[in-house]
Amino acid sequence: MAKKSKIAKAKRQEKLVQQYAVKRAALKAKGDYIGLSKLPRDSSPVRLHHRDVLDGRPHAYMRKFGMSRLNFRELAHKGQIPGVRKASW
């Protein structure tokens, strides 16, 4: 489980990215790099880091499922992820 402050910071960053997305795209299209540098640092989508939706874990994130490998394994064993089966060959 990630610290609550880190999860809150990630949510705040996501809001900032959405808030400034249009303005950032317009400045990029114009080539106004001075204007881009005046935008908040956290409004850049490059600074976002994927986090597990269940517990906020930042490492071993699986994009396809939106969760870390630990939670994926646990839910897959319980049969709670549709379309995921244990491999046998």
Swiss-Prot record:
- The species this protein was found in: Lacticaseibacillus paracasei (strain ATCC 334 / BCRC 17002 / CCUG 31169 / CIP 107868 / KCTC 3260 / NRRL B-441)
Q: What does this protein do?
A: Binds 16S rRNA, required for the assembly of 30S particles and may also be responsible for determining the conformation of the 16S rRNA at the A site.
Q: Which gene encodes it?
A: rpsN
An example GO BP is: translation
GO MF, one term, reads: structural constituent of ribosome
In terms of InterPro entries, this protein maps to: Ribosomal_uS14, Ribosomal_uS14_bac/plastid, Ribosomal_uS14_sf
Give the protein family.
Belongs to the universal ribosomal protein uS14 family.
The identity of this protein, by name, is Small ribosomal subunit protein uS14A
The alphabetical list of record keywords is: Ribonucleoprotein, Ribosomal protein, RNA-binding, rRNA-binding
Question: Which cellular component appears as one GO term in the record?
Answer: small ribosomal subunit
Q: Name one Pfam family in it.
A: Ribosomal_S14
Subunit details: Part of the 30S ribosomal subunit. Contacts proteins S3 and S10.
